[in-house]
Swiss-Prot record:
The keyword Nucleotide-binding applies. The gene is atpA. This is ATP synthase subunit alpha. It comes from Shewanella pealeana (strain ATCC 700345 / ANG-SQ1). GO terms for molecular function: ADP binding; ATP binding; proton-transporting ATP synthase activity, rotational mechanism. It is an enzyme of class 7 (translocase).
Length: 513
């Protein structure tokens, strides 16, 4: 068969038109050194800070040091099989994690991959772990409460939606217990929770997950895990991953709560990475940007206004504000709050709950020291009835502490001083609370009302706990309507005060404790 020149040119033209060029221009480099989870790469000219670098075997590293002739990157996971001379590629994107409602009730690692054996996660998409916090104009003032269920916290150190409240204290004195109870208390409040475990034992995290499940709070919670045995890079990035998952709800006009347990271990992981990258060490061998490490994370916790939510959702959600409340945890050494990381985080947050070893050992749990614990913005968000009733609680405890120290040296005390001491002792006893037993607004209100109005005067100190338990049982069975009204409205007026007084008078007559 012979083809003429026209047919040949048409055929060539057709082939040219159908030809598709599928090429991907990606920068490629070579590993020149591997040690302790850090790789040095030569030849990556246009890599950006924080960019994911593709390694052999479908693994990734993150570029942290951009130097004149090499790039320092930290490997996300095991690095034993990496060798000098291996080829790596830039990806043009920073680390992203899955977000969405499909993550609720699941346990995931830093990268958002499920580790609970419940199958794949149905996410709504991916979001970058590092984003800029909302600006001042996009924020709204904190004026709605987050109930922790602890009398000592909700009455004296109230937390608002969108606040950052630090939980600080030595090891093994109930920091995690307080945060977990706060999560358990949100199971019916509509607040979605994220629990980020950094540098902890796997057995400890398994116990926390089991307790959340037992109390029906896991279905409302995302657990992000970077155990002590995992790479320092994963421990450093875990809080940012959890924050991104919490922001998903905030940006859609919902309320969320995130617990970072704990940021001391994250700072240690970051120090390890920085020293291996040969960055110059500063105070306590931490790098110069360890303040920025925590500030850029905690500034993302905020309450955003309705305009921000409407703009973010492209008009799908209107007239609703969103919030992300943060409870960062910091572990101190021998009660030293003046160390580098504790002072940094205290200055970033909107208040702190200080837990004290001596109080814990004396049997006061939660071991909250009301003298140096403070909430800078939560007062505006406090429930009305708790705010009205709890005004004298902090004062009573502060006076009691002062007088208790003084009375050890005084041989005889006048009646007024003795009355103050006895009242303080009973209020201190009333503030004790069991773990995994968060209290409703009504229960807290009744207990505080009893203390404020002098109903504990005639109760023996060792019977205060029994008195409270019997009182709450009586109120919830005999005056369920009143308790429901308080829980629903949180209001306090002359009618409610009168009803509470009549109910307590009736209970005291029964002498059933």
């Amino acid at each position: 068969m012979q083809l003429n020149s026209t047919e040949i040119s048409d055929l060539i033209k057709q082939r040219i038109e159908q030809f598709e060029v599928v090429s991907e221009a990606r920068n490629e480099g070579t590993i020149v050194a591997v040690s302790d989870g850090i790789i040095r790469i030569h030849g990556l000219a246009d890599v950006m800070q924080g960019e994911m670098i593709e390694l052999p075997g479908n693994r990734f590293a993150i570029a942290l040091n951009l130097e004149r002739d090499s790039v320092g990157a930290v490997v996300m996971g095991p690095y034993a099989t990496l060798a000098e001379g291996d080829k790596v590629k830039t990806t043009g994107r920073i680390l992203e994690v899955p977000v969405g409602r499909g993550l609720l009730g699941r346990v995931v690692n830093t990268l958002g991959e499920p580790i609970d054996g419940k199958g794949p996660i149905d996410s709504d998409g991916f979001s970058p772990v590092e984003v800029i916090a909302p600006g001042v104009i996009e924020r709204k003032s904190v004026d709605q409460p987050v109930q922790t269920g602890y009398k000592a916290v909700d009455s004296m150190i109230p937390i608002g939606r969108g606040q950052r409240e630090l939980i600080i204290g030595d090891r093994q004195i109930g920091k995690t217990a307080l945060a977990i109870d706060a999560i358990i208390n949100q199971k019916d409040s509509g607040i979605k929770c994220v629990y980020v475990a950094v540098g902890q034992k796997a057995s400890t995290i398994a116990n926390v997950v089991r307790k959340l499940e037992e109390h029906g709070a896991l279905a409302n919670t995302i657990v992000v895990v970077a155990t002590a045995s995992e790479a320092a890079a994963l421990q450093y990035l875990a809080p940012y991953s959890g924050c991104t998952m919490g922001e998903y709800f905030r940006d859609r006009g919902e309320d969320s709560l995130i617990v970072y347990d704990d940021l001391s271990k994250q700072a240690v992981a970051y120090r390890q990475i920085s020293l291996l990258l040969k960055r110059p060490p500063g105070r306590e061998a931490y790098p110069g940007d360890v303040f920025y490490l925590h500030s850029r994370l905690l500034e993302r916790a905020s309450r955003v206004n309705a305009e921000y939510v409407e703009k973010f959702t492209k008009g799908e959600v209107k007239g609703q504000t969103g919030s992300l409340t943060a409870l960062p945890i910091i572990e101190t050494q021998a009660g030293d709050v003046s160390a580098f990381v504790p002072t940094n985080v205290i200055s970033i947050t909107d208040g702190q709950i200080f837990l004290e070893t001596d109080l814990f050992n004396s049997g006061l749990r939660p071991a909250v020291n009301p003298g140096i614990s403070v909430s800078r913005v939560g007062g505006a968000a406090q429930t009305k009835i708790i705010k009205k009733l709890s005004g004298g609680i902090r004062t009573a405890l502060a006076q009691y502490r002062e007088l208790a120290a003084f009375s050890q040296f005084a041989s005889d005390l006048d009646d007024a001083t003795r009355a103050q001491l006895e009242h303080g002792e009973r209020v201190t006893e009333l503030m004790k609370q069991k773990q995994y037993a968060p209290m409703s607004i009504a229960d807290q209100s009744v207990s505080i009302f009893a203390a404020e109005k002098g109903y504990l005067k005639s109760v023996a100190l060792n019977k205060v706990g029994d008195f409270e338990a019997s009182l709450l049982s009586f109120m919830n069975s005999e005056h369920a309507d009143l308790m429901k009204t308080i829980n629903d409205t949180g209001d306090y007026n002359a009618d409610i005060e009168g009803e509470l007084k009549a109910s307590l008078d009736k209970f005291v007559e029964t002498q059933t404790w």
